[in-house]
Amino acid sequence: MLAKTLPLCLLALLAVGAAHAAEPPDYKPWQDLLTKYYDPAKGMSYKSLKEHGKPALDHLRQQLATVDVAALAKPDQLAYWINLYNISTLAVVIDGYPTKSIRDLSTDPIIRLNVFKKPSVKTKAGAISLNDVENDKIREGFKDPRIHFAINCAAKSCPPIRTEPYAGARLGEQLDDQARRFLNGPHGARLAKDGDSVTLHVTKILDWFKDDFETWGGGRMVFIRKYLTADKQKQLDAAKGKVDLAFDDYDWALNDAPR
């Protein structure tokens, strides 16, 4: 009898835990900023945001820094970290604007990406870096390669910011949509045939984070194919696996909207 009732008890405990998960943060202020200052076809209006929206951005960061992330349901935790990463990256650029690239905000002329190592992200547990959020909280915490199309590093080659906040209740759908949009977009996957040779040109992200896609995404080619349009899938399948990957140069120019 005990053996039969134990699984039921465990299910009951899990249900109670889910029922008592904290409500996710209010991301409406983030939506308002995106609506006012961001156009995915043009970029972020950093100048206007710095001149008119910085108080709202600062207040949003203060509010998110009070969130007890561990009390949230798992999907809400991942949504929180993705939103916080994008909001914090935006704040880093605003604080150093005008600039031609987020890399130019680094204090080390040799290691031009050390801007991502500064403790610029406010959390309830204290300030951490953008790298901490990306690598420790998001990548290792959730092991989902789709996140690489959701976090934005303020560069032109980076997958665009989503025009809405990420939400735990819709997170899987949103992450799938981000991967699909990017891989079929202007900086996405492009097949080139030269005689019997077929090359698939893709973002450098799939090179930098190869292990994420191989370990958590079933392999780079499997992951890419899943999100391509039916027409591109047919072209890929016609190559019968004889496809070389080539990685595009990464454009670190700021994703700044033309003024």
Regions found by a protein language model. Name each.
Residues 1-5:
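Positively charged n-region of N-terminal signal peptides that target proteins for export
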Residues 7-16:
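Bacterial N-terminal signal peptides
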Residues 17-21:
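Sec/Tat signal peptide C-region and signal peptidase I cleavage site
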Residues 22-82, 86-259:
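Interaction/scaffold regions that mediate signaling and macromolecular assembly across diverse proteins
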